[in-house]
């Protein structure tokens, strides 16, 4: 149970959408990407070695902002020279505000909801013949049995498939932030992080329309069929400061999150909290480092757009100096 919970919460850090699947595909409304529209003047290739950096500053403080991938290879290699230099003497390192878990008594409710999601026998038995063939081929390539996907819920099947796909191809949502946190703590730099309670969102999964859940499952299946090529290419672009190339990464889960009751409010809260944390870091003279997922960082009404709206100075990777 602990492992299943961990997998579900990991996927929900960027995803969500479910409900019982129909025997034949149902035409759902299109999924909306909350970060589809970017602030184009912020999408600039970095001129320094390694990944691209933005800055947010006032009269006596600079926050160096590193936009990080939402999905990347585990233990991804990147040029850390600029990061290491900025870590020295930093007031704080703000990690991505993407941590989600069931807190306190909410863990019990989350566990009960998960049991409901994991009931119903092999998921593939509920699929139309054409989709069943695709799904069976995908799970067999991952080395998994039909029993492994025991659920009547499209989201639960999609989450499990996504987790298995990521594990098989050694992809993660936590790098490079995990390495940055380790280096910051080793250097004695205070780490700022935030964890959200997944309980309410997990309950909302069960109320999401079946057609939307099916569409999310289809997107995950298509990603598993396509393989990790897009993600690996985007990761290489990110490591070289090619912001436009890095933005080509998969967007399955972010669109699904918006379809869940409360999903838009949750996305709004994470962006607002990230912007507020950067603004608070400016209250102390000196400099700090912040990591923010790349698209939420650069989107219209994203983190940098909000900070510019507060009158703070934002510079692009084409302007940032060492």
Residue ranges and their predicted role:
Residues 25-265:
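Structured, acidic catalytic/metal-binding patches in enzyme active sites
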Residues 16-22:
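Boundary at the C-terminal end of the N-terminal hydrophobic targeting segment
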Residues 6-16:
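Bacterial N-terminal signal peptides
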Residues 8, 57-59, 283-284:
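Short hydrophobic "helix-edge" motifs at membrane interfaces and signal-peptide entry regions
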Residues 260-322:
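A cross-kingdom marker for long, charged
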């Amino acid at each position: 149970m602990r492992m299943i919970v961990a997998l579900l919460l990991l996927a929900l850090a960027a995803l969500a959408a479910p409900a019982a699947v129909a025997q034949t595909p149902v035409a759902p409304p299109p999924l909306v990407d909350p970060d589809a529209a970017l602030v184009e003047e912020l999408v600039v290739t970095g001129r320094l070695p390694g990944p691209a950096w933005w800055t947010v500053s006032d009269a006596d403080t600079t926050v160096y902002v590193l936009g990080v991938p939402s999905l990347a290879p585990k233990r991804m290699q990147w040029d850390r020279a600029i990061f290491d230099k900025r870590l020295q003497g930093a007031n704080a390192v703000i990690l991505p505000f993407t941590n989600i878990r069931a807190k306190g008594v909410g863990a019990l409710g989350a566990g009960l909801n998960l049991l409901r999601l994991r009931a119903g026998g092999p998921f593939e038995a509920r699929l139309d013949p054409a989709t069943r063939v695709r799904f069976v081929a995908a799970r067999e390539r991952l080395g998994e049995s039909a029993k492994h996907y025991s659920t009547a819920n499209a989201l639960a099947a999609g989450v499990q498939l996504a987790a298995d796909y990521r594990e098989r191809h050694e992809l993660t949502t936590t790098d490079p932030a995990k390495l940055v946190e380790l280096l910051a703590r080793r250097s004695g730099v205070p780490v700022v992080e935030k964890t959200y309670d997944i309980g309410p969102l997990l309950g909302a999964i069960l109320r999401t329309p079946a057609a939307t859940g099916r569409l999310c499952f289809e997107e995950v299946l298509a990603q598993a069929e396509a393989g990790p090529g897009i993600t690996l290419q985007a990761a290489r672009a990110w490591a070289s400061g090619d912001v436009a190339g890095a933005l080509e990464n998969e967007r399955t889960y972010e669109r699904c999150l918006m379809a869940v009751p409360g999903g838009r409010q949750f996305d709004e809260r994470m962006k607002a909290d990230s912007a507020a944390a950067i603004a608070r870091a400016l209250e102390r003279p000196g400099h700090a480092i912040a990591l923010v997922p790349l698209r939420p960082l650069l989107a219209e009404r994203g983190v940098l757009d909000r900070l510019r709206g507060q009158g703070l100075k934002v510079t692009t990777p084409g302007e940032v100096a060492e």
